[in-house]
């Protein structure tokens, strides 16, 4: 728990003024609650027994005042703690995504997307509960316990000893329950992440599932995951919910003893009826915040586990360390010197590129040839520094690639692949992605990509909204938008990875002509199985099983 608050202390410090309000309002709630129980004594002794009419006129207002203070304090406490919780969660979520976006591609290849989504949504939700609800309730209930204990001791120190003995007796079984809950909470969150990963996989591949008649297979797999989640959840509840009944039972024993001993004290005249009922009311009310605190500590175990899962990401350093040199000049040369690249597969390294030595230069059009899996895309990934070579070195303009900042490197490179990224936004926003919108330039790039004609026929032209993944476009239209985006970036290195595979012959010829026009002062890399596209190349590079066979 100490580590938990240490991790979030920098966020909590930003809200110290709000915490002062929370502390003050919680104190008002505690005092109002204690005062309310104390008022039982004058109600019975002064009004019902002594028939004091003056007190009869005053006491109802005092009761209203007590509950007004309690209600107002609870509202202020709830509002400010939720404000703190929401703000901290917002900042942690921002920090998590920032951290994730710095990770190397190998991290994303090894981690299920649903697992990451679960951490950035579900796990953070548990942190919010701990930093807002649990924190405020702990302060409020803790102060309430102090106030009620004060009333209990004030009314009868002797009976207080009997009534409060329950606290240390309950500590041993409660601590064992809490340790068990923490262990189950970890399994529960991991199971929840598996469900999220399964759903993410299904929704991302729903078309393939339908085509392959895989609905029943996927449903069966999901039912299995869901059943496991249910069983762990029930087990968690079965353990966590023991604490409240246990406190109720032990509390009932203490109250029974107090009634017996206190009744004798009243009969002997050692304590007034009002004082005894004030005591018993405070004692009854005391067990409620104790039970709530016990439940909070139990529920807090989930937040501790969630915090560990969140900080696994926040404290993880990217495997690819960014360089310090900003690439200001145009890219003139890209050189590979004895480069090897291995991917981890089933805890074993498998080389996808072996002993690659070659050089690309400005004003060249390079054709990367080879069968699927020969290493063409892996070569491109190394140029973009999405992966680090296992052995060997890569140079950009005779500078080691690892010395160059990733941002400045990627600003000089545009890539168009078969997997086109279209997000929910206007055509203009998709083409100018990450850059300022210049309508004239956007239309020029759309024209070169043979996309302007169909865009202008859309309801709002370049301001027309595209659906997520571009589902309101054909495959060829999506590819042309991607080509226009690459052209808009005006990069010195253009990489086309099967970028014209979804285009008809006429459109493909027009796009190829645009590529030829871009050759001047640029380096263009073509990955294609289409012989007519490969004819554009001035240099051919062939890969077989990760090795160069033609250069």
Locations of regions flagged by a protein language model:
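ABC-type nucleotide-binding domain
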Residues: 330-551
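Pre-NBD coupling/linker segments of ABC/ABC-like ATPases
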Residues: 317-329
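Transmembrane helices of ABC transporter permease
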Residues: 14, 18-29, 61-69, 133-187, ...
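Conserved catalytic Walker-motif region of ABC-type ATPase nucleotide-binding domains
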Residues: 100, 222, 310, 336-338
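An intracellular "coupling" helix at the cytosolic face of ABC transporter transmembrane type-1 domains
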Residues: 105-106, 122-131, 135, 139, ...
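Juxtamembrane helix-loop junctions of ABC transporter transmembrane domains
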Residues: 1, 24-25, 29-41, 45, ...
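Membrane-integrated ABC transporters
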Residues: 1-33, 48-62, 77-81, 85, ...
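Helix-loop-helix
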Residues: 49-55, 61, 151-165, 235, ...
